[in-house]
């Protein structure tokens, strides 16, 4: 009996190591420059002509990275490629970290995003700006001064769940409870990765909870 108890105790550390707990968690929303939920004809009309840019936003609600608390830190990434982002072509991205974060938090947030999200491609610049991230019900409103803004609403009656065959893409990052959103508006003023762009009134967003 003692041998079995000893063997069980020795297994506990192994089980703990095999199931690491996420370090960071919070809200996430992204907007693409192509509809992610649409009919087949609409999708085929866009897939080779657009969808080369995206805006991604994180609101960390809890967690630490490299020993630094990132709770309350907000960040935006603007990603650009020469082909539709679904094609896995080379990408460049610009990060915008909330100016309310400390230097240590900024460095840790940049490190966490670069290490966990290959979807960013090559991060060519990091900017600081007052980033706001509002999530109320199924509504998301994110802004970074005059650099970037997005406004997303959940789809009525969760239509994307009822017609999954019309969801043509996956989010750029893994999400829990992923939903498709309606983009009321998104705008990027331009920077190191792309010229300015804007879109509105299309089903081009994903939102949910992120865990890393």
Indicate residue ranges for each PLM-predicted region:
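Positively charged n-region of N-terminal signal peptides that target proteins for export
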Residues: 1-4
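Hydrophobic h-region of N-terminal signal peptides that target proteins for export
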Residues: 8-17
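Processing junctions and N-termini across compartments
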Residues: 12, 28, 35, 154-155
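The N-terminal extracellular segments of secreted preproproteins, especially immediately downstream
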Residues: 13, 33, 40, 159-160
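Residue-level detector of bioactive/disordered segments in secreted/extracellular proteins
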Residues: 16, 43, 162-163
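N-terminal Sec/ER secretory leader and immediately downstream segment
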Residues: 19-97
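Mature, soluble, non-transmembrane domains
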Residues: 98-210
């Amino acid at each position: 009996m003692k041998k079995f108890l000893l063997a069980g105790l020795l297994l506990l550390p192994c089980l703990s190591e095999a199931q690491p707990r996420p370090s960071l968690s919070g809200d996430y929303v992204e907007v693409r420059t192509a509809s992610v939920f649409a009919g087949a004809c609409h999708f085929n009309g866009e897939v080779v002509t657009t969808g080369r840019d995206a805006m991604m936003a994180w609101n960390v609600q809890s967690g630490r990275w490299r020993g630094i608390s990132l709770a309350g830190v907000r960040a935006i990434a603007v990603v650009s490629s020469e082909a539709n982002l679904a094609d896995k072509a080379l990408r460049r991205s610009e990060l915008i970290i909330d100016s309310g974060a400390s230097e240590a938090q900024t460095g840790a947030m940049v490190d966490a995003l670069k290490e966990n999200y290959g979807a960013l491609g090559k991060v060519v610049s990091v900017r600081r700006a007052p980033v706001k991230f509002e999530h109320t019900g199924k509504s998301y409103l994110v802004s970074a001064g005059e650099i970037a803004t997005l406004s997303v609403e959940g789809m009525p009656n969760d239509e994307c769940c009822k017609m999954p065959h019309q969801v043509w893409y996956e989010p750029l990052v893994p999400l829990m409870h992923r939903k498709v959103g309606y983009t009321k508006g998104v705008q990027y003023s331009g920077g190191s990765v792309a010229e300015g762009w804007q879109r509105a009134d299309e089903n081009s967003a994903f939102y949910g909870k992120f865990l890393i």
